[in-house]
Amino acid sequence: MKAVVLAVAALFLAGGEARHFWQRDEPQASPWDKIKEFTTQYVDSVKDSGSEYLKQFETSALGTQMNLKLTENLDTLSSTFSKLREQLGPVTQEFWQNLEKDTEWLRQEMNKDLADMKQKVQPYMEQFQKTWQEEVERYRQKVEPLSTELREGARQKLQELQEKLAPLGADLRDSARVHVDALRTQLAPYSEQMRERLAERLAALRDSPSLAEYQAKAHEHLKTLHEKAQPALSDLGQGVLPVLESLKATLVGAIEEASKKLSSQ
């Protein structure tokens, strides 16, 4: 199971490199940076929207009577969560950095395979693009006189024009289907070859002597992450507990006061 997880992680990293290779984009942020950025944005969004509703409730008649201090409690929880995120950040980032380092050879091999595949496939893609442009130009030349006829003709000729365009559109679709099928047939051997190479790379990764060593490292990282998370989670629980107790006591007091008023009537 650990080997499967490691292989998926390696494919994730190698896949990111392959995407940059084909798109020629600048490398993006690390997975941990993306997770951290998303979490920060989500928590800030929830905090901002939640604070607005809590302030409205606190200023209401019921909120003033109950004196819940929800905004203050929300700030306390936000501070505790930020502390937890800061404690877990270095450990998780170190795990991703080690994973990228240990799978560097796999990414290099995959990039070589992709470069070789791109070189072989490029002529077919260029020919497909050239043929398709010729088909579109041929279609445009046939349609242009009909468009002129439409502009110069009356409305009663619209139906006739549509009838003339229908077979041309069908012809273009049929031509496109033929070219796509031909391209698919030409690329099929390369797709199969790429799948075989990927299987070989994964087999080499699975049989690598360093796999057991890396599994031990991953286990140690997870153990360290768990140990460092425990105090922060404990602090989070301690921060939430007073809020719940305060809310419970306030609600109980409000219920008792309401019961006394009903009894005295």
From Swiss-Prot:
GO process terms (BP): acylglycerol homeostasis; cholesterol efflux; cholesterol metabolic process; lipoprotein metabolic process; phospholipid efflux
Signal peptide feature range: 1-18
Top-level taxonomic group: Eukaryota
Modified residues (Methionine sulfoxide): M110, M194
Record bears the keyword Phosphoprotein: yes
InterPro entries: ApoA_E (IPR000074), Apolipoprotein_A1/A4/E (IPR050163)
Transport as UniProt keyword: yes
Keyword set, alphabetical order: Cholesterol metabolism, Glycoprotein, HDL, Lipid metabolism, Lipid transport, Lipoprotein, Oxidation, Palmitate, Phosphoprotein, Repeat, Secreted, Signal, Steroid metabolism, Sterol metabolism, Transport
Protein name: Apolipoprotein A-I
Naturally occurring in which organism (per UniProt): Dipodomys ordii
